[in-house]
Amino acid sequence: MDVFRTTNLTTSRQGSSGAAYGGLIFAQALAAAENTVNETLKPHAMHSFFLLNVDTALPVQYHVRRVRDGRSYSTRTVEAIQEGKIVFILQVEPDAAIHQEEMPNVTSWKELKCLTEVLSWLRTEIAENRIVVKPSVERYIRRFERRTDEKIRDLFEIRPCNIDQYIGVGEMSTSRTFYSWFKALGCLGDCEKLNRYLVAYNTDATMAGSAFRPHFVNDFQPSMILSLDHNVWMHQHLMRADQWMLFENTSTVAGRGRAFTTGKLWNEDGTLVLSCTQEIVLRSRGIVSSI
């Protein structure tokens, strides 16, 4: 068994000060697995389960089990251990793609603004009654504002294709499909693994939103949102996290306190880079919304 240890668990993405961002744990576990296989083998299928909250104040050990090693395939199982308890499990396998879905025809990132750029404009519109928002949306906006006020800088810039739909202002929509462009800040260079890990890190950022944002129309206020599992299939080995990519997120079903979401990621030239799925816990202390 190979063991890797980290104390770097704090990011701007975490929902609370003591709970680690799931995408970070996923990316670190992937890095640990890749460190135990031949350089010629690239990760394709990754299946993970979030078992317990990961405390950012405590170190995590990643235990990598070498399940199978062959000339063309290897399988690794990674267990994230904190205080003797398994908090996260990831299984990694390689594979290849033979066809792909076409990239959707959406607005280019060049014509869009990032979330931080629209906050001041949005506050002015609300103050002058040109935009009226529901309490659930007001709470959501304040969350973004707190991050800006505290000068918390994300690793990525995200530009939603429909900012009104993304935040829940303007003409309300019940669409459960959302499109966003994203890229990492700064230049990452040609390190294949670093780019891959950062792309994996970011896949956990927006998927849950496709489940609860459509319910803003009913003033739905989620009281708990957390990932139960996260699965990624990488169709391309070479990817640049510091170049613009289009992320499509869709929620196909929600009920009984859970929701299922899917994601597809294209690079700017239309190549499908990866597909992913996620099941989340989605709860509210307020109204029950149905759309």
Predicted regions and their residues:
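Terminal targeting signals and extreme-terminal segments of soluble enzymes
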Residues: M1-I291
